[in-house]
Amino acid sequence: MLLWILLLETSLCFAAGNVTGDVCKEKICSCNEIEGDLHVDCEKKGFTSLQRFTAPTSQFYHLFLHGNSLTRLFPNEFANFYNAVSLHMENNGLHEIVPGAFLGLQLVKRLHINNNKIKSFRKQTFLGLDDLEYLQADFNLLRDIDPGAFQDLNKLEVLILNDNLISTLPANVFQYVPITHLDLRGNRLKTLPYEEVLEQIPGIAEILLEDNPWDCTCDLLSLKEWLENIPKNALIGRVVCEAPTRLQGKDLNETTEQDLCPLKNRVDSSLPAPPAQEETFAPGPLPTPFKTNGQEDHATPGSAPNGGTKIPGNWQIKIRPTAAIATGSSRNKPLANSLPCPGGCSCDHIPGSGLKMNCNNRNVSSLADLKPKLSNVQELFLRDNKIHSIRKSHFVDYKNLILLDLGNNNIATVENNTFKNLLDLRWLYMDSNYLDTLSREKFAGLQNLEYLNVEYNAIQLILPGTFNAMPKLRILILNNNLLRSLPVDVFAGVSLSKLSLHNNYFMYLPVAGVLDQLTSIIQIDLHGNPWECSCTIVPFKQWAERLGSEVLMSDLKCETPVNFFRKDFMLLSNDEICPQLYARISPTLTSHSKNSTGLAETGTHSNSYLDTSRVSISVLVPGLLLVFVTSAFTVVGMLVFILRNRKRSKRRDANSSASEINSLQTVCDSSYWHNGPYNADGAHRVYDCGSHSLSD
């Protein structure tokens, strides 16, 4: 019987492994034409592998695989999807890409592998993606990038790596890669060298470097000079110093060489100086250090992803580009659309999109004072002004905003539904103001917001459901406020990847209903709070231990009790922190519980993001099949056993009847009964033995 079970399981697994199904013909996925393009939508289908499936071979299509369980990609994983022109793999829990996984996808131009758990890009990770122009890998756990990771991507122009754990970029990582748009926000970069890194992206049109712990020392001098020499408006956002302390919070472009390098009186002689104005070339095509087959020998401006025009690539190969010269009279010059810029502000075109309006430090006291109103503003900077309140009416004419900076004002009042018209807003800065309460109504309408910075306010209260209005929020900066507690379910409905709560007044943070909702967290900063190292903090400590040092940014020091003052409670054992609890537990249980994932007494919930007890489906399916087959054979065996028992019972009944007849025959033969017919009227009932035979 066991042999039959094994044979059946093997045959079924073999058959299942060789069946190839068309995801469109068999209606496994939703396949629809949208604006002439076929979209193959396989969202949340539970796929763990794609080698058993195929897609239409007669036309090109966009392949959507987000929300599945493709945790590992093996070589030739997409061999049956060779007509795909874009690939979306967000939210798959993907943690490993084996080199060769993308072989066959030579037509793919856009690859989205964001919101996964990828830790490294190895050499030849992207082998096979010959035509790739756009790579999005933000919100991963990316730490290590091999110098040859992008060497096969000779057409890559847009590289999005924000919100990872990158602390350094290797030399020659961008060699022969024609990068024009680079996003490195929200990583752990302290410096970016010019040689062998920045010098290899001469065609840069847009770069984002915010939210990195920049170390503003001599090593950052080359980055500062490079930023000053790239095209105007190429830098999006700010580069803010994290260290040294004397420069903390200062914008890099506001520093001087003396600030960065006090002991050095001149620029590092190893860096090539930018050419003098008279040495610059006249506008025209120049050779670039990268070429592909069939590509002409000129700069590659190309087309921006959104359909706009990129800045022309007038770059030199071995020297940094010359800074664009902006005259004072051009700042308030009428724009191409003949709309003047509000007085005191400067307006610039964003390549391929709308306007960037800079009203920083212009003594603006109200947004109503900004006249005329420009409807196509996408980035509005109002930092360092005297604004006291903001109201819904202020943003009626700014429906296209993507970035809004209201930092370092005097804002204490935000009218409910103020941002309701800003449906496209992605970045909101309200740091260094006087906000004291956050509520859902204040942020209504911000359905696409990804970044919210409200540090350095006076926030004491966050009402329940505040962040539900921002379902796409990924980065939340709440440090340096007056917070003492967080409401239950405060993070329900959002998938935060980075959270800053340092320098508040938290004595402990509950796990259940608060921290256990941070299932997508990749970086959290909690230092500078007055932690009370007593029994109540044990669940929080165990949660922090499960995160590990890669996610937890800094040490957590006790404020009370006195014997633990300024000690990192992560280095203390649970029985030291809570001796009265562990004194009740046997030594065996105590030693076991030190490494456990939670205490039943404290109601700590395990974090599903770190749950390693899940069974792989490749093990689960054969196991269930074996159980099913075994159960079937067991049922059949029981039926056979029951039928055999019935036959034996019938035989016993037949033998018993024969014995009774023989006994009756014996009695008749002894003439105990009178011969003759049955006489009902007699004193005795008499049977006619002669009328019966054994055959009856």
UniProtKB/Swiss-Prot annotation:
Query: Where can this protein be found?
Result: Membrane; Secreted; Synapse
Q: Which GO terms describe its cellular component?
A: extracellular region; GABA-ergic synapse; glutamatergic synapse; plasma membrane; postsynaptic density membrane; synapse
Outcome of mutating residue 695 to E: Able to promote neurite outgrowth as the wild-type
Q: Tell me where in this chain the LRRNT domain is found.
A: 18-57, 332-373
Alphabetized UniProt keyword annotations:
Glycoprotein, Leucine-rich repeat, Membrane, Phosphoprotein, Repeat, Secreted, Signal, Synapse, Transmembrane, Transmembrane helix
- Tissue specificity remark: Expressed predominantly in the frontal lobe of the cerebral cortex of the brain. Also expressed in some astrocytic brain tumors such as astrocytomas, oligodendrogliomas, glioblastomas, gangliogliomas and primitive neuroectodermal tumors.
Q: One GO biological process from the UniProt record?
A: synapse assembly
The answer to whether keyword Electron transport applies is no
Q: Which residues does the UniProt record annotate as the domain LRRCT?
A: 212-263, 529-580
- Region of interest (Disordered), ranges: 265-314
Q: Give residue ranges on the Cytoplasmic side.
A: 644-696
According to the UniProt entry, which residues carry Phosphoserine? 695
Pfam families per the record?
Answer: LRR_8 (PF13855)
Q: Which residues form the signal peptide?
A: 1-17
Associated condition reads: Trichotillomania: A neuropsychiatric disorder characterized by chronic, repetitive, or compulsive hair pulling resulting in noticeable hair loss. Affected individuals may develop physical complications and often have overlapping psychological disorders, such as Gilles de la Tourette syndrome or obsessive-compulsive disorder.
Looking up PANTHER family in the UniProt record yields: SLIT AND NTRK-LIKE PROTEIN 1 (PTHR45773:SF7), SLIT AND NTRK-LIKE PROTEIN 4-RELATED (PTHR45773)
Q: What does this protein do?
A: It is involved in synaptogenesis and promotes excitatory synapse differentiation. Enhances neuronal dendrite outgrowth.
User: Assembly and interactions?
Assistant: Can form homodimers; homodimerization requires repeat LRR 2. Interacts with YWHAB, YWHAE, YWHAG, YWHAH, SFN, YWHAQ and YWHAZ.
What protein name is recorded for this chain?
SLIT and NTRK-like protein 1
Q: Which organism is it from?
A: Homo sapiens
